[in-house]
A protein has these predicted regions:
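Membrane-embedded alpha-helical bundles that constitute the cytochrome b-like, heme-associated redox core
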Residues: 1-248
Length: 248
């Protein structure tokens, strides 16, 4: 018997898909800016401006990405328990550390089943803490590189100090390396989400579209709190058991 629980609120799902789209566009345009692999004929009227077009798309998408990060940060303090910033620091509680150990044992093939949680397991929460840090770092390095080429912009006074510590080429390399790390994470994220969905049968993959997951009745409380988090629960309709045949 399972119950339907509203886990991922609209801002969580919205920022998730905005981030996905932004990372795809930023990776494509960013790689081109660093290594122009599309040859444009000089006879085409837009040929001299093709790099400018790619850079323009990159910059606009970067601002959308930063806006999405800010919205998700705001919702980490306003949303439900599964959207909370506490989910990024599971190691601060005993329940979180226990859940993290369970998840790690599952991924190392020591345990047969993953931990049953409504939101992210504690190991995933720690991973997302690293991902948020990478989001901030790639945004900062990108704005610093932009400010270097546009010293009249607001970003040069805010980020120019970094070039007294590190040279531009090293900063650009860091920007590219973080991009590859995020791409690698995305591949692992899709695989692990599909795996856990198949193992638990809780609708994990569809939940990022609908917001709902399906949890077993009597499932243990999430590691985020030492009690069952208040949620919008919609019990599944129950089918009345068939009458037992009379014994002779």
């Amino acid at each position: 018997m399972r119950r339907r629980v509203y886990v991922w609120e609209v801002p969580v799902r919205l920022t998730h898909w905005v981030n996905v789209a932004c990372i795809v566009v930023l990776s494509f345009t960013g790689y081109y800016i660093g290594n122009p692999y599309i040859t444009v004929s000089g006879r085409e009227p837009y040929a001299p401006n093709f790099m400018g077009l790619m850079r323009g798309i990159h910059f606009v998408t970067a601002y959308i990405f930063i806006a999405s990060i800010l919205l998700r940060t705001y919702w980490a303090f306003r949303g439900n328990a599964w959207a909370s910033w506490r989910g990024l620091f599971p190691f601060l509680t005993r329940e979180g550390r226990k859940n993290m150990g369970h998840a790690l044992q599952y991924y190392l093939f020591i345990r047969r089943h993953p931990p049953e949680v409504a939101g992210h397991n504690a190991l995933a929460g720690t991973t997302y803490m690293v991902i948020v840090f990478l989001y901030l770092l790639i945004s900062f390095t990108g704005l610093a590189l932009y400010g270097l080429l546009h010293p009249a912009s607001i970003w040069w006074p805010l980020t120019g100090w970094v070039f007294t510590i590190i040279d531009a080429q090293t900063l650009r390399l860091a920007h590219h390396v973080i991009m590859y790390l995020l791409i690698a994470f995305a591949i692992h994220h899709i695989y692990s989400a599909w795996l856990v969905d198949m193992e638990e049968g809780n609708g994990l993959m569809s939940s990022i579209f609908s917001g709902f997951k399906f949890l077993r009745m009597g499932q243990q409380p999430d590691w985020i709190e030492n009690r069952m988090v208040v949620a919008k629960v919609e019990p599944q309709p129950q089918v009345a058991p068939s009458e037992q045949p009379a014994s002779d």
